[in-house]
Amino acid sequence: MESSPFNRRQWTSLSLRVTAKELSLVNKNKSSAIVEIFSKYQKAAEETNMEKKRSNTENLSQHFRKGTLTVLKKKWENPGLGAESHTDSLRNSSTEIRHRADHPPAEVTSHAASGAKADQEEQIHPRSRLRSPPEALVQGRYPHIKDGEDLKDHSTESKKMENCLGESRHEVEKSEISENTDASGKIEKYNVPLNRLKMMFEKGEPTQTKILRAQSRSASGRKISENSYSLDDLEIGPGQLSSSTFDSEKNESRRNLELPRLSETSIKDRMAKYQAAVSKQSSSTNYTNELKASGGEIKIHKMEQKENVPPGPEVCITHQEGEKISANENSLAVRSTPAEDDSRDSQVKSEVQQPVHPKPLSPDSRASSLSESSPPKAMKKFQAPARETCVECQKTVYPMERLLANQQVFHISCFRCSYCNNKLSLGTYASLHGRIYCKPHFNQLFKSKGNYDEGFGHRPHKDLWASKNENEEILERPAQLANARETPHSPGVEDAPIAKVGVLAASMEAKASSQQEKEDKPAETKKLRIAWPPPTELGSSGSALEEGIKMSKPKWPPEDEISKPEVPEDVDLDLKKLRRSSSLKERSRPFTVAASFQSTSVKSPKTVSPPIRKGWSMSEQSEESVGGRVAERKQVENAKASKKNGNVGKTTWQNKESKGETGKRSKEGHSLEMENENLVENGADSDEDDNSFLKQQSPQEPKSLNWSSFVDNTFAEEFTTQNQKSQDVELWEGEVVKELSVEEQIKRNRYYDEDEDEE
């Protein structure tokens, strides 16, 4: 700093920049660089204020100095002056200030002009306050002066102010304190007592409440401070009318005369930049700044002032507002008129809003203020999200159970594999054509089969495999797809093999291929999704197996495949008819040939089969010839039987004559056995000897060989003599009856019972 008087021009532009633009930045970002710059301006402002006071007192004449000092002396020495003398002194002081602003020194032209303007405003305030006492801003702006405090009290309260204000307010605060030292002595108590003011603001006038309900906060504050010159003075621009009283209009004209003098031509070139920036900011963000300033300071006020307390706690907030306006007035003093009006209007709005809230509001005004502040909140209505439905169950999906997969909305519980119905997550699913699968079944159904040519599983594989009943499959496929889409598949899909077995059993019982295919179809469609190779091949192989099971039905005891087709059907018919007879002895005789044949055919090697065939055919021919003779002799009922039924006639004839020929058979039987030594080693006359002979001859192969030779010999004898032929056959059959044991007869009967059940 130079020792010469400080030139205000350079610092005016810089301080303007700080107060207008960077003041908000300091509060928001707390930038250290800006704070340092601000501290420099703060020191410079203190020095300029001190120089301003000295230059004002030194450069003015004694008349002006004497008038100012007398006003101060009267103010502090005689606090009980009348209102008329006090208003006269205030008018004189205001005229002195105006003349002092008209004739400043050359060095401090702009500085003195701004200081005179601030002093003039602060001196005009008490005059307007005296004439319009019930004002909100008057009580809130300088409350410490109401109680008649001296300068020491004011300095202590200024320390309280410093605690409330931030670093960004220091310059404004100290400059305001220095200016208040000049102006505070000129203001005394109000003519209207505090009790009356208190009642007015507690009860509230009906006009005030109506306006509060009808208008916004700024309009209501303006209505309350209708007679206040401090508000109207700031509101009024050039060519603008106000709704204030006659005194405020007088001061308005005086103010309008002074405004052209304050805007010097030397500063216009510098103010062009700031006019573009500050006016644009104040005009565009007028309402937003107004809301922010009012909202932030109302919160501070509500925290501090919760009761109807003396004006002491209000000093911080009200002085803060006063300093804010005074700082803006210092910056606006060197600006052109339009920019000054814009920024002044914005400051007026922020200032007008404050006096509404620092005072304790009535219930009506509180309700109105709440109702006015609520509409922007009421505009934010709760909008429920759009109703979403689950793709699977078609029910409403709520946010807690919502799952978005494959660009579709599911319930978390409905997000399941369409094949196995297992619950899936976003990491374990695969989708194909809008259907959800778990990864193992997706690979099994589509990837491992390699059916990429058919749309990768979009066309069912059954169409490629099954070609028998295409029409039925075409009808079944859409039904299957519709069922699969409507309801998630149950986990019981693997019951399909059980159904397959049931269908096979039913088809075996029905023995109808058409019915089998129809019943097999649903099992195939279910099996199609599980089994590989295709189930149509399984169905055909299953039917072949069924036929094999029918053809090779086991019989006991087992027979040789070669001997079975050679068994004549007439023997079976005869056996059926013979089976009707009651006695075991009668049933046992015709089975002798068949029993011996069966035993030899089962247990003898295949090389023995030709003699068996030979012996069997010869015995059959002999039986047919004997049956023909018997048919001529016997009754009509036996004659009706055919040659194939010759055994039946023979046995009935034998049954009638068996008693008379028993002894003869036994004798001739012994002679035949002696001739055929290969057949019987130890001859016997009784049945016991025959039984012992059968027991001794346990190996079956020699028995079969001896039996075949015996048959050849007997038939050779039959062909020699015709008369002996019939006797030989009868004796041969009688011996066979003796040879058969009871156990073998029972076995034969059991075997034919099973055969009958089979047929």
UniProtKB/Swiss-Prot annotation:
A motif (Required for interaction with NPC1L1) lies at residues 164-166. The modification Phosphotyrosine is found at Y229. The modification Phosphoserine is found at residues 4, 15, 55, 132, 225, 230, 242, 263, 343, 350, 362, 365, 369, 374, 490, 601, 604, 609, 617, 686, 692, 698, 726, 741. Residues 78-131, 146-182, 211-264, 323-381, 509-709 are annotated as: Disordered. Residues 493-513 are annotated as: Required for interaction with MYO5B. Residues 96-105, 146-177, 247-258, 516-527, 556-567, 656-673 have a biased composition (Basic and acidic residues). Residues 674-691 have a biased composition (Acidic residues). Disulfide bonds: none annotated. PANTHER family: OS06G0237300 PROTEIN. Interacts with NPC1L1; bridges NPC1L1 with MYO5B. Interacts with MYO5B; bridges NPC1L1 with MYO5B. Interacts with PXN; this complex stabilizes actin dynamics. Interacts with F-actin and G-actin. Interacts with LUZP1 (via C-terminus); both proteins restrict ciliation and may work together to regulate this process. Binds RAB40B (GTP-bound); interaction influences LIMA1 subcellular localization in lamellipodia during cell migration. Actin-binding protein involved in actin cytoskeleton regulation and dynamics. Increases the number and size of actin stress fibers and inhibits membrane ruffling. Inhibits actin filament depolymerization. Bundles actin filaments, delays filament nucleation and reduces formation of branched filaments. Acts as a negative regulator of primary cilium formation. Plays a role in cholesterol homeostasis. Influences plasma cholesterol levels through regulation of intestinal cholesterol absorption. This is LIM domain and actin-binding protein 1. The lineage of its organism: Eukaryota, Metazoa, Chordata, Craniata, Vertebrata.
